[in-house]
């Protein structure tokens, strides 16, 4: 195994230590079935975090995916409520997710405005659209739209060969996005765009087309997450993705992505998703209040960002310390 997987190995070791530590507090944490099936509570965050990694590698950001999930979820409910067959409703929901991503990409490309500002705007646009649809359908905030076929609501709660379906879909997404980013020419273009967009343009790399693909994949993954969440909870609500933003970005940064673009790892993000997810699960099983666990997740994000920054600039830090040692302050 090449040395470039060192960060991923460190994350994997940290994941094992985390599980063992929580297992010492609550032995249920060491039960394999509990570990596998508890992923259904957070693995949709990972499905979105994987393409989000590629967006961040390209030097962009998308903070609207939580609202995209809510919009796609309520759209699925409205379509079903209107009599659209379930397979067609799911297909249209997936197309809606991809369209949301393309809207983000189009606005970023043609306005030249910072992606953070654009996706902050579309976050409110998609969230407002979801609330509008929900109100038109007569759905309440907590109950949402229900009455889905049992075959659909059972889907996200099934298991195949002992693995829950949401985890299997996450693993399929992991394989697809890893192959695309790390093993294709288009994936290498993403790294080049993140390192220097101007050089990428002069190198005849299709920057705009690549960005459209990245944001569309994030929107599509958001729609997949929405379908799984509606199936899992049996209800389509506009707030289903509202809490996904911080854990997803934490997983991407913890997984090794440079927030300024140019580097990142799909496998690292996948391991980090499990790390963050099991952290929340372990804290809950240890009886820690949700407010405290959320604060710890925020602290983890800060520590990771600072740690990665120190790691990226360690040579400059060493030189600065050497200068201070040679020229101490009077």
Swiss-Prot record:
Periplasmic side: 26-42, 137-159, 231-237, 280-285
UniProt topology in membrane: Multi-pass membrane protein
Transmembrane intervals: 5-25, 43-63, 68-88, 89-109, 116-136, 160-180, 210-230, 238-258, 259-279, 286-306
GO cellular component: plasma membrane
GO MF, one example: transmembrane transporter activity
Main location: membrane
A family per Pfam: BPD_transp_2
Keyword match Electron transport: no
Record bears the keyword Transport: yes
Record localization: Cell inner membrane
InterPro entries assigned: ABC_transp_permease (IPR001851)
Superkingdom as given in the UniProt entry: Bacteria
Keywords: Cell inner membrane, Cell membrane, Membrane, Transmembrane, Transmembrane helix, Transport
Cytoplasmic side, ranges: 1-4, 64-67, 110-115, 181-209, 307-330
Oligomeric form and interacting partners: The complex is composed of two ATP-binding proteins (LsrA), two transmembrane proteins (LsrC and LsrD) and a solute-binding protein (LsrB).
Record-stated family: Belongs to the binding-protein-dependent transport system permease family. AraH/RbsC subfamily.
Role summary: Part of the ABC transporter complex LsrABCD involved in autoinducer 2 (AI-2) import. Probably responsible for the translocation of the substrate across the membrane.
Entry protein name: Autoinducer 2 import system permease protein LsrD
């Amino acid at each position: 195994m090449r040395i470039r997987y060192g960060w991923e190995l460190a994350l994997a070791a940290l994941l094992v230590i985390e599980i063992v530590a929580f297992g010492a507090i609550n032995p249920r944490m060491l039960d394999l079935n509990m570990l596998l099936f508890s992923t259904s509570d957070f693995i949709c965050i990972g499905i979105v975090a994987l393409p989000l990694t590629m967006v961040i590698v390209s030097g962009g950001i998308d903070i609207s995916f939580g609202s995209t999930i809510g919009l796609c979820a309520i759209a699925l409910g409205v379509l079903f409520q209107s009599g659209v067959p379930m397979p067609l409703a799911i297909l249209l929901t997936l197309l809606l997710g991809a369209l949301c991503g393309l809207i983000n990409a189009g606005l970023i490309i043609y306005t030249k405005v910072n992606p953070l500002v654009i996706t902050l705007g579309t976050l409110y646009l998609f969230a407002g659209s979801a609330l509008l649809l929900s109100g038109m359908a007569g759905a309440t905030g907590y109950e949402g739209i229900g009455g889905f076929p049992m075959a659909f609501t059972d889907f996200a709660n099934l298991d195949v060969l002992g693995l829950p379906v949401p985890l299997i879909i996450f693993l399929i997404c992991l394989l697809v996005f890893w192959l695309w980013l790390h093993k294709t020419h288009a994936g290498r273009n993403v790294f080049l765009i993140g390192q220097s967009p101007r050089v990428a343009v002069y190198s005849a790399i299709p920057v705009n087309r690549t960005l459209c693909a990245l944001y569309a994949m994030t929107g599509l993954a958001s729609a997949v997450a929405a379908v799984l969440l509606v199936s899992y909870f049996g209800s389509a609500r506009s707030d289903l993705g509202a809490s996904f933003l911080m854990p997803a970005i934490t997983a991407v940064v913890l997984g090794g992505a440079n927030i300024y673009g140019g580097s990142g790892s799909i496998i690292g993000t996948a391991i980090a998703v499990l790390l963050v997810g099991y952290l929340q699960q372990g804290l809950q099983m240890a009886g820690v209040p949700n407010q405290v666990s959320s604060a710890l997740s925020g602290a983890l994000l800060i520590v990771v960002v600072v740690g990665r920054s120190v790691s990226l600039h360690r040579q400059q830090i060493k030189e600065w310390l050497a200068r201070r040692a040679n020229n101490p302050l009077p």
